[in-house]
């Protein structure tokens, strides 16, 4: 397969990652009374932050939405890199490397703090990026 194909596959997986993350909003997993109590405490305790009043829930929910925005951005950028790879894939190797390292670290963080689905998505994207890197050095990428 060609570099552009691996990058576009990574883009599609990233888009699915974005869809999964975004449809999971508000990212609360528990329905037990203790879980609900924690969520309500996150919503009710406000504190000043740089001149505005925020809660832990505001940060939790806001960061979740921010992650969705950046996931969509990554999907679009990976797709665009796939298009660029058709003309000069070798020049994309430094960019592919940066994305590869970021997704490997994302997988590690997923293992440490989250659950299997984001880990699998990050690993699949890392594999695609690794293969894109390897094929980008060849002439007919």
Regions flagged by a language model, labelled:
Residues 9, 13-16, 63-66, 95-98, ...:
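Physicochemical signature of membrane-embedded alpha-helices that form the seven-helix bundle of GPCRs
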Residues 26-33, 83-87, 111, 115-118, ...:
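Transmembrane helix-loop junctions in multipass membrane proteins, especially transporters and channels
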Residues 87-124:
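Hydrophobic alpha-helical transmembrane segments of integral membrane proteins
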Residues 124-136:
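Alpha-helical transmembrane segments and their membrane-interface exit regions
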